Amino acid sequence: MAIKTLLQFMRGFFAALLLLCFTTGCSTWKLGKSGQNKIAGKTYVIIGASSGFGRGVAEELGRYKANVVLAARRTELLEEIADTIRNSGGTARVVTCDISKPEEVQRVAEAAVTQYGKVDVWINMAGVGAIGRFWEIPAEDQVRVIDVNLKGFIYGSRAAVDIFIKQGYGVLINIGSVDSETPLAYHASYSASKAAVRNLSLALGQELRLNGYKKIKVVTIEPWAVDTPWWRHAANYTGVEPKMALMDEPDKVVNAILRKSLRPKKIVPVGWKAKASSFMANVFPRLNEHITANVSQRYQMEMPPAAPATQGALYKPMEEGKGVDDGVDERMKEEKKMRNKQKKE
């Protein structure tokens, strides 16, 4: 009888969880006409605009007739994106920037204010990773992850807040990850950096509130694993091509970023998988950590095809991986077909 009651409780519990995730999924919907009109004429700074979420957000902002300051290391690619924005009705300024270098981040801030006189939204989007067993990844590569993902966000956040305090308002958006609550096996330094970004944003938001800057908001966007060039650009010491189960499409994250630039919220897990992961991390932390680690073992160490070790885009930009998405999901489907074919043979 007790087991039956427990099973009934668990069914109801997970049904309620799924309902919560479904009903809170509107943040991933595309902006309506009213939201698009609110963005028109606003100035957005995007550091990490050359691919992935950054490129997706930039191109959408162009369609909504925003002013966009594009910053990343791949200047020629930024110029292409700037042309797309201008052809869509927006305006754009390109600034070459490595977010780990404070003087280059400051140059982005100065260019934005000089050109547009204000910054409404500043987005720290640049990010790198180093995947593999912690003891097999060179220490300098892991430090580089911290240089970009944490120190770079400190430089970007400081530059943004300096502008916002002078003008009296603004929205700072830092891109985090579900890894901030559920550290992922074989992503040790990346998970550490994203946990730090979450706490940086929360602490900064409280400092602004306590000092009377109520019109300055700080947002942390926390996606699930997403099909972007991040996987191609990450340093990889696994011996295979690492991926993740149930990857999301980048448009979900792009839409969430744009929505929260208008209606800021402290922490934004994107989509039902990220929300479920956050819930499990807080309610069933041991179980969640165990399941996530096992999934990572399968998808990032055992199942993918072999690949050579690489430093990816840690130290210098790569030619490959220019789009918003990177076709990871399609490659996974093809790999599954090949495995099934080999089993039959």
What residue spans do the PLM features occupy?
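Conserved glycine-rich cofactor-binding loop
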Residues: 43, 50-51
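Conserved glycine-rich Rossmann-like NAD(P)H-binding loop of the short-chain dehydrogenase/reductase
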Residues: 65-81
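The beta1-alpha1 cofactor-binding region of Rossmann-like NAD(H)/NADP(H)-dependent oxidoreductases
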Residues: 75, 96-107, 139
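Substrate-binding pocket helix/loop in short-chain dehydrogenase/reductase
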Residues: 133-134, 138-146
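Active-site helix of classical SDR
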Residues: 157, 193
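Residue(s) in the substrate-gating loop at a strand-loop-helix junction
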Residues: 177
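SDR active-site lid
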Residues: 210-301
